[in-house]
């Protein structure tokens, strides 16, 4: 008997199409798994079984009539930063505890049109600020590989639920690593598309020039199938790029012979664990065995500045974006007060957690008159230098290969009181957002029973190339097939 929760999208699709299983069965199997594991994993903010079962029923009806697309009837989860009409969307913040959006995010509509089934909304660091889900105002998600460890963040719930086989796939958002870092920590495939490839309409904004939505899946093929469904122009997002969506799954043939891959040395910094470097070296050996050429002498000298640039630009944008939470328009409101200003202050003081407040203060400072040129403008200039450096490298290479993270999943509480240590988790992922590039993290082995991720970075809008390399690697390895014992 097939273990329904272990199936990929592609495998489930085949069984659904051949009428060997129904979406209702598949959905029920996942809902049961959620019920069994959630007390331990805590990946979900909200589970919506009624919605899931009625969507599964609709999918089964469509399939009976021969109307089946790659995601029809497939149970999925969405990070709680994506607006879902009629379903609470909290961003794991007290500020939006009871916020029920009156509309769907663009990607949510797209997935609904495909017939995907929504199991629920996943836990995250508050407003996507963090690398461990410990900044959730509600609870910390556990890493399915070792429940004393964090699952990464900010999309920790979305990564954990796929790793724990509670959902076939999920969506997250990535501003500085929030998809790739938890994908690495949980040993799943996590994809950040090129900036502009997926509409941000209905994604609660953190840092708009960096945010992108992307999938968590069990392998690169599934990732391509989800990208096919969510990518594409949308005039409601002014940064959405008007170009035809490629077929992300075409070219996934396992062949990367002749591909030129560069390995930038700055990504193997002082804070990198040597046993992670070893795993990455093994992975490079696999890629070279597949016929790709590997150049380890690549240098991107501005890399060390990326973290500083990010922690000026992202908080600046956040301070502007989060000004909307004033207790008047929507969300939490504290109002037993004397006047409007006091109400606003108290709303924000009580509604936001410490990390969100820290970022708002950093951003407000960086944007304030007198400091704007010294911090914000300077960071923008360095951002351009970082982008140019990548563009130069891509004249020689088809893709760049790095570790996804400098560290292994760490213990719950370990970095919570040291924000800088937490920020350092993203040294390998942040430069990619700064330059708007596509990048994927794929499972590359284990150290002390904990997952290591490999990052493949592509040229702007060469998303298919990154996926092709990821797929080829997965044809030659089995790391992505390993699942935690739960
Ligand atoms: N949002 C992200 O992509 C994660 C990053 N760790 C941050 O805290 O900003």
Curated annotation (Swiss-Prot):
GO molecular function annotation: ATP binding; glutaminyl-tRNA synthase (glutamine-hydrolyzing) activity
Gene3D superfamilies (alphabetical): Amidase signature (AS) domain
Alphabetical UniProt keywords: ATP-binding, Ligase, Nucleotide-binding, Protein biosynthesis
One cellular component (GO) term of this entry: glutamyl-tRNA(Gln) amidotransferase complex
Gene Ontology annotations of biological process type: translation
Top EC class for this record: ligase
EC number: 6.3.5.7
Catalyzed chemical reaction(s): L-glutamyl-tRNA(Gln) + L-glutamine + ATP + H2O = L-glutaminyl-tRNA(Gln) + L-glutamate + ADP + phosphate + H(+)
Function: Allows the formation of correctly charged Gln-tRNA(Gln) through the transamidation of misacylated Glu-tRNA(Gln) in organisms which lack glutaminyl-tRNA synthetase. The reaction takes place in the presence of glutamine and ATP through an activated gamma-phospho-Glu-tRNA(Gln).
NCBIfam families found in the cross-reference section: gatA
Sequence similarity: Belongs to the amidase family. GatA subfamily.
Summary of subunit composition and partner proteins: Heterotrimer of A, B and C subunits.
Designated name of the protein: Glutamyl-tRNA(Gln) amidotransferase subunit A
Protein source organism: Dehalococcoides mccartyi (strain ATCC BAA-2100 / JCM 16839 / KCTC 5957 / BAV1)
